[in-house]
From Swiss-Prot:
Homodimer. Keywords: Aminotransferase, Pyridoxal phosphate, Transferase. Its cofactor is pyridoxal 5'-phosphate. The gene is dapL. This is LL-diaminopimelate aminotransferase. It catalyses: (2S,6S)-2,6-diaminopimelate + 2-oxoglutarate = (S)-2,3,4,5-tetrahydrodipicolinate + L-glutamate + H2O + H(+). InterPro entries: Aminotransferase_I/II_large, DapL/ALD1, PyrdxlP-dep_Trfase, PyrdxlP-dep_Trfase_major, PyrdxlP-dep_Trfase_small. The keyword Plastid does not apply. Pfam families: Aminotran_1_2. GO terms for biological process: lysine biosynthetic process via diaminopimelate, diaminopimelate-aminotransferase pathway. Belongs to the class-I pyridoxal-phosphate-dependent aminotransferase family. LL-diaminopimelate aminotransferase subfamily.
Length: 411
């Protein structure tokens, strides 16, 4: 019989979101009359922008004609999409990023896990706490950690707490680490990093030959001036950082699937013999070997994001969710509940009232308000006592959910 990958057995029982689903299903079965509003998983609800839909329909028609039919595309994605990304998302912000350094993929979640294929097994890895669970679980699956302790922390990982006291932006590690996961605007806390904070991380990485894996999936939600949208706005980042981006939350592509990863050609890693190897070549080899690219139709839809009409429609979509976040924040304040985030991100990080634990707060919201959030402890031990609410929902659902919460907690 074939041997399994035993590292999977180290994963904590049940991924966070399946456990949420289990509890919600049990409650719904016991209370079929309850109108449950789900504000947990960050999936979008509003339609694709018209510019994207029109471009995709046109691409479908092209696929129906021999003269314009497309088969396998380029390993990195079509150049016209990569050029649009480089021009609008990076060069327009003064970032020295070329289209050849951009790799189109079907999701930043996939890329955040797949990037481990080109990294060694003996790196010291730092993650923030709380953190997007994918960063941790993919390292566990790859054998980069030991078992989890009673707090759910894995042996071998360096945890950097995000707290209200440090404004949910982690302090630099006291020791040398090789790989650093950063996500700003942050999931789950909704916090952002200032230019000075990111410069400190870049300086640390360059001083210690560390690699920053920078998740910028929510950069379109930044509203405050002066907050960097890309790690490459920081001098020196080309020599120490890989950036992950996605069209999922920017343009509603969660069901359409398109994202991209930026690997500068000046970025180097060290081989076992001490020689320096450029990571661009390794990632190109990995992608061309294991990935067949994103559908032509989808890439045309993504390209339309950068059209004049697409930019207007995407900004309106983002603003819709940010308005939801504002409603959530302000209504929680009315109920006397402390909350963070929701200004530069679609997530609101809610402090559990009355000394409740994360899961106790989750259960109380579910049972008394019929509202589903995401327990903060599911993102790490430092998330205990918090709960994440997502602004990805209809306006009617958000307003009704907050009405219920105010009626229960505001009395």
């Amino acid at each position: 019989m074939a041997r399994i990958n035993d590292h999977f057995l180290k994963l904590k029982a049940g991924y966070l979101f399946p456990e949420i689903a289990r509890r919600v299903q049990a409650f719904a079965a016991a209370h079929p009359e309850a109108q449950i509003i789900k504000m947990g998983i960050g999936d979008v609800t509003e339609p694709l922008p018209e510019a994207c839909r029109t471009a995709m329909i046109r691409a479908v028609e092209e696929m129906g004609e021999r003269a314009t039919f497309r088969g396998y595309g380029p390993e990195q994605g079509y150049e016209w999409l990569r050029q649009a990304i480089a021009r609008h998302d990076f060069q327009a912000r003064g970032c020295d990023i070329d289209a050849s350094e951009i790799f189109i993929s079907d999701g930043s979640k996939c890329d955040c896990g797949n990037i481990l294929d080109i990294l060694g097994h003996d790196n010291t890895i730092a993650i923030t706490d709380p953190v997007y669970p994918v960063y941790v679980d993919t390292n566990v699956m790859a054998g980069h950690t030991g078992p989890a302790n009673e707090r759910g922390e894995y042996e071998g990982l360096v945890y950097l707490p995000l707290t209200a006291e440090n404004h949910f932006t982690a302090s630099l590690p006291q020791q040398k680490v090789d790989v650093i996961y950063l996500c700003f605007p942050n999931n789950p806390t909704g916090a952002v990093a200032t230019r000075e904070h990111l410069q400190a991380w870049v300086d640390y990485a360059r001083a210690h030959n560390s690699l920053i894996l920078f998740d910028a999936a929510y950069e379109a939600y930044i509203t405050e001036p002066g907050i960097p949208h890309s790690i490459y706005e920081i001098p020196g980042a080309r020599e120490c950082a890989i950036e992950f981006r996605s069209f999922s939350k920017t343009a509603g592509f969660t069901g359409t699937r398109c994202a991209f990863t930026v690997v500068p050609k000046s970025l180097r890693g060290q081989a076992a013999d001490g020689s320096w190897v450029d990571l661009w070549s390794l990632w190109y080899r990995r992608q061309s070997t294991k990935f067949n690219g994103v559908a032509y139709i989808v890439q045309r839809g993504a390209e339309a994001v950068y059209s004049e009409a697409g930019q207007v429609q995407v900004r309106a979509l983002v603003q819709f969710y940010l308005e939801n976040a504002r409603i959530i924040r302000e209504q929680l304040a009315t109920a006397g509940i402390q909350a963070y985030g929701g200004v530069n991100a679609p997530y609101v990080w809610v402090k559990a009232p009355e000394g409740l634990s994360s899961w106790e707060f989750f259960d109380k919201l579910l049972h008394t308000c019929h509202v589903v959030g995401t327990p903060g402890s599911g993102f790490g031990s430092a998330g205990e006592g918090y709960l994440r609410l997502s602004a990805f929902n209809s306006r009617a659902n958000v307003e009704e959910a907050m009405r219920r919460i105010v009626s229960v907690f505001g009395s």
